[in-house]
């Protein structure tokens, strides 16, 4: 059998989008084999991550059709735009670029959660680490002293967002930070708004589109995850970053973080228990 692809091979190849329908049932999740064929597809590192998404829908009474409809609408909206960086080949190239940045040079990756504090970020900046922000947590970077803030923004590899992160998310988008934009059943207005902000900037953010259905959607990815924080960890693992190289900052299950955006506190606390299960599935400490 062929050996698994190296990070160099994965980063230099672009995903092809063959003439398939919009929705196709997932093949068995043999990550190495799939990545040899489509190196920039971001697949779950563990089948359990897709099972959890199904259980979450059942727990909260959400419909799979709503998740699929939002995903389809997002894909159509992005691909109907006239922004060159949002075409399907350029989105695949954005994945390849992020793989090069996060994997080819062995480095730590710090995922910023909704409860992240400035001192945690400052300590991480003392090391050669990259940052990945879960939605509005990117806002913590602008609370740092000016010179340090700009250095921190330069370390931000991407944000992972479903569009409801408020000012922190908007600022990252206005800076042209790459965005993993997520579709689910009740965030149509949020992702539409974020796309409008991005489209109006001089240099629109590169996009990678994600969904949470158990089907393959060409042009989109489902690396697993539920909340923005644990989905960010799923994204980083799916790109090939070892679990030992990932540090979770501001990831807590006992409080609703200040960067969570507008949310119902009771429901959010329930969601955080699912985040805990996902991170345990990934074997990532926090």
Specify the residue positions occupied by each region the protein language model found:
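C-terminal catalytic "cap/lid" subdomain
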Residues: 114, 118, 166-167, 178, ...
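Glycine-rich beta-alpha loop segments
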Residues: 122-127, 134
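N-terminal donor/sugar-recognition subdomains of glycan-related enzymes
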Residues: 29-109, 119-122, 256-286
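N-terminal amphipathic/basic-hydrophobic helices that include classical n-h-c signal peptides
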Residues: 1-35
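Buried, small/hydrophobic-residue-enriched core segments of structured protein domains
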Residues: 215, 248-250, 267
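Glycine-rich anion-binding loop/nest that anchors nucleotide
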Residues: 110-116, 135, 221-229, 244-259
């Amino acid at each position: 059998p062929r050996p698994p692809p190296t990070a160099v091979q994965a980063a230099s190849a672009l995903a092809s989008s063959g003439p398939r329908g919009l929705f196709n049932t997932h093949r068995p999740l043999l990550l190495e084999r799939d990545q040899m064929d489509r190196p920039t597809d971001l697949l779950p590192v563990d089948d359990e991550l897709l099972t959890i998404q199904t259980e979450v829908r059942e727990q909260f009474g959400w419909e799979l059709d709503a998740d699929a409809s939002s995903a389809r609408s997002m894909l159509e909206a992005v691909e109907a735009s006239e922004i060159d960086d949002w075409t399907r080949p350029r989105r695949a190239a954005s994945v390849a670029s992020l793989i090069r940045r996060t994997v080819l040079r062995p480095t730590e990756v710090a995922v910023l959660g909704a409860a992240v504090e400035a001192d945690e970020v400052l300590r991480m900046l003392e090391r050669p680490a990259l940052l990945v922000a879960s939605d509005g947590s990117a806002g913590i970077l602008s609370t740092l002293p000016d010179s340090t803030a700009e250095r921190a923004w330069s370390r931000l590899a991407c944000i992972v967002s479903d569009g409801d992160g408020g000012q922190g998310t908007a600022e990252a988008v206005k800076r042209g930070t790459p965005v993993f934009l997520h579709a689910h059943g009740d965030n149509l207005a949020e992702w539409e708004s974020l796309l409008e902000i991005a489209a109006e900037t001089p240099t629109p953010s590169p996009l990678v589109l994600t969904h949470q259905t158990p089907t393959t959607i060409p042009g989109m990815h489902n690396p697993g995850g539920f909340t923005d924080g644990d989905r960010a960890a799923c994204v980083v693992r799916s790109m090939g970053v070892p679990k030992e190289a990932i540090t979770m900052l501001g990831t807590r299950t006992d409080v609703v973080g200040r960067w969570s955006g507008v949310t119902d506190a009771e429901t959010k606390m329930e969601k955080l228990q699912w985040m805990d299960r996902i991170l345990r599935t990934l074997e990532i400490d926090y």
